[in-house]
């Protein structure tokens, strides 16, 4: 699958995430959002898993960006990484999962626009 195809699939997944959020299914919405990020940023995720600490730092810093979309995307990407066994083997001592309500707020804001 090339990048253009991945971008289209990621867009479909994010649209479905909004649909799930509209009907109040936040767990599915959150899962679809993370799948969308995993598809769209597949190459970046693989680079991070292989040890690209500079790229990892970019995404960890982006979690505190002023732009809500960038912040939520970065947090979703970090969650995707944390769920990957290869990533955990390399970085587990440095990362842990923290419950995040911002993804749900972000999905709800996008729907209300």
Region annotations inferred by a language model:
Residues 106-113:
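Short acidic DE-rich linear segments
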Residues 2-14, 45-55:
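Short amphipathic alpha-helical heptad-repeat segments
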Residues 95-98, 105-106:
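Charge-dense (acidic/basic), low-complexity helical/coil segments
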Residues 24-27, 36-95:
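Acidic, low-complexity, intrinsically disordered interaction modules
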């Amino acid at each position: 699958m090339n990048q253009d195809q991945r971008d289209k699939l990621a867009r479909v997944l994010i649209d479905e995430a909004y649909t799930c959020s509209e009907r109040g299914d936040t767990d599915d919405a959150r899962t679809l959002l993370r799948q969308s990020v995993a598809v769209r940023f597949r190459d970046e995720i693989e680079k991070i898993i292989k040890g690209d600490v500079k790229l990892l730092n970019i995404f960890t810093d982006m979690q505190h960006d002023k732009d809500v979309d960038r912040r939520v995307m970065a947090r979703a990407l970090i969650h995707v990484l944390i769920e990957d066994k290869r990533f955990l083997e390399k970085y587990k001592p440095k990362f842990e999962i923290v419950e995040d309500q911002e993804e749900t707020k972000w999905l709800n804001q996008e729907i209300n626009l």
